[in-house]
A protein has these predicted regions:
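Acidic, glycine-rich catalytic/binding loops that coordinate metals and/or anionic ligands
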Residues: 346, 351-353, 394, 401, ...
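A structural signal for short beta-strand/turn segments enriched in small hydrophobics and glycine
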Residues: 365, 406, 446-458
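Primarily a LysM-type cell-wall glycan-binding module
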Residues: 41-43, 48-50, 54, 83-122, ...
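Non-catalytic cell-wall polysaccharide-engagement segments
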Residues: 29, 245-366, 504-528
Length: 528
């Protein structure tokens, strides 16, 4: 039996793990028909995906208006030519045999940098003050011992703002682009949550819910199956347009969600310092260059789940690479990034945020920090359950209330999003995301709310919930934020602190401590 067929059969066996329903509570799912896939299962499963190649791309027209932006100058993603994959290790710019001279990037923390470079935080020095906690100023110069040696592929691929649903998407209209492109996607539709949904609606929904840049998702779909600018070359691309080929997980919506999860894993794994290498389907492992940005690592990680190393190299660094197509479709990503980055400005701090229920009410802190949205996202969400009795999983008569003033920019699929800067864009500034808000009496989009205004009722609607509650998370400029990270989550003066595992944690205020407990015990009750 050929090696490729062995890889394929092993992949199918591992992929069956996705058919086992998750027992985790309070976890957002993609739809009622889709089982949630754990991060561990996703990592294990996708290492065994069969080898795949993109179809021949349809050249993007050279039009100068929507949907095609004129290609700009080459970005820093330009890579060495005529080099075999893995044959030319390169020391990152600014490094020597003994030390790296590293310029801090937006979103960097001392702890994450130390993990990426494989050193202890105290081994990193700078002529400027280095805080143990909090965000480092972008551009601060650090001297770091070189313990990783030479690394492969240090060149940046995409800026962070082109990977997440960031301010760079404010002037991008997904629907206009898709309909202007006149490819297969324009006529495609499928059932999602029991409702017929167009391909354009699917792309936009995945982008908004997972906070992944729609340009990236569209370019990926075109690169893998030619859906956006042309027609699929093979019938298999209809059922599995990205080629993940997970049994029972067919269709555009499910495949795009898998891709979004993988992008999320790479992006936030690098951001936190927990991801330092990638492993290909054939078992080859490479150390990631520690000077890369989160967006570039997200792309490297995603494509390592789709290709063995030679194919991965061609897809990211070859003459007809994914990045070449991305630029043909949307213009220079680095030029756009220059207009919106850094995503984390100097001195950024969370605005005043209140607990999501009315003053005087008693609720249970039923879930400590856990995944903000999906596998790979930071532990940015916390849960609150009304202490009003009633059936375990029902729509409560209690109200979820606005934790800060702002504009409701999204109210659908049991999610309410408040835009705190009021500009009407979820991808800019501070936003608060509430999940499991019942359909009944849920506030519509487009309404301005003040602190304590009612948003809707907590419920079990959407997700694998085992009890009535509201799930609450934050984003800034489209990036999910860790609840116990460099931008602390503080509600009504209570500081969120994570525990050892998902859903474990505390609320701290002075000498008081509330312990998260899904069962709603006395130690989890909090009164606002």
């Amino acid at each position: 039996m050929s090696t490729a067929r062995i890889h394929h059969r092993v992949g199918i066996i591992l992929l069956l793990a996705w058919l086992i329903p998750s027992i985790a509570c309070n976890f957002p799912t993609r739809s009622r028909q889709i089982r949630e896939i754990s991060e561990a299962s996703l990592r294990q499963t996708l290492t065994a995906l069969p080898n795949a190649s993109p179809v021949e791309e349809t050249p993007a027209p050279d039009a100068t208006e929507t949907p095609f932006s004129p290609a700009a100058t080459e970005s820093p993603a330009t890579t060495p030519e005529n080099s075999a994959p893995g044959s030319q290790p390169t020391s990152p710019p600014g490094s020597s045999s003994l030390f790296f001279i590293y310029s801090a990037q937006p979103g960097d923390t001392l702890a994450a940098i130390a993990d990426r470079f494989g050193v202890a935080p105290e081994q990193i020095t700078s002529s400027d003050y280095l805080p143990d906690a909090g965000l480092l100023p972008a551009g601060q110069i650090l001297t770091i011992p070189n313990v990783v040696g030479e690394t492969l592929y240090p060149g940046a691929l995409l800026p962070d703002s082109e990977v997440i649903y960031s301010p760079s998407t404010v002037d991008f209209h997904t629907y206009d682009y898709i309909y202007g492109a006149s490819g297969f996607l324009i006529s495609f539709g499928e059932l999602v949550d029991g409702e017929w949904t167009s391909g354009a609606d699917i792309l936009q929904r995945v982008a908004v819910e997972t906070s992944i840049n729609p340009r990236l998702l569209l370019a990926l779909l075109e690169y893998r199956s030619r859906w956006v600018l042309g027609q699929p070359a093979d019938p298999s691309y209809i059922s599995y347009p990205l080629g993940f080929n997970v049994p029972g997980e067919r269709g555009l919506y499910k495949e795009m969600y898998i891709a979004a999860k993988l992008i999320t894993m790479g992006y936030y794994g690098w951001r936190s310092g927990t991801l330092t290498d990638i492993t290909f389907p054939d078992g080859i492992k490479i150390r990631l260059s520690p000077e890369l940005n989160a967006g570039s690592v997200a792309l490297q990680y995603l494509f390592s789940r789709l290709y063995p190393q030679p194919g991965w190299y061609d897809a990211l660094y070859g003459n007809n690479s994914f990045l070449t197509l991305h630029t043909q479709m949307f213009g220079d990503p680095w030029g756009r990034a220059a207009g919106v980055e850094p995503l984390f400005p100097l001195g950024l701090a969370q605005p005043a945020i209140e607990l999501p229920f009315l003053p005087g009410e008693s609720w249970s802190y039923s879930g400590g920090p856990h995944l903000a949205w999906t596998s790979g996202s930071p532990r940015g969400a916390i849960d609150f359950s009304p202490a009003t009795g009633g059936p375990t999983c029902s729509v409560s008569q209690a109200w979820v209330t606005a934790s800060a003033p702002g504009l409701v920019v999204r109210s659908s699929n049991n999610v309410v999003v408040i835009d705190l800067d009021g500009d009407g864009f979820e991808q800019t500034g501070w936003t608060l995301v509430y999940l499991h808000v019942a359909d009944y009496e849920r506030i519509p989009a487009g309404v301005w709310v003040n602190t304590d205004d009612p948003l809707g009722h907590p419920s079990c609607e959407r997700g694998n919930s085992t009890g009535t509650h509201v799930h609450m998370a934050r984003k800034y400029n489209g990036e999910w934020l860790d609840a116990d990270g460099p931008l602390p989550f503080v509600l009504s003066g209570w500081l969120v602190q994570k525990g050892a595992r998902n859903y474990e944690g505390y609320l701290i205020q002075g000498n008081e401590r509330i312990t998260a407990n899904p069962g709603g015990s006395r130690i989890s009750i909090i009164v606002r």
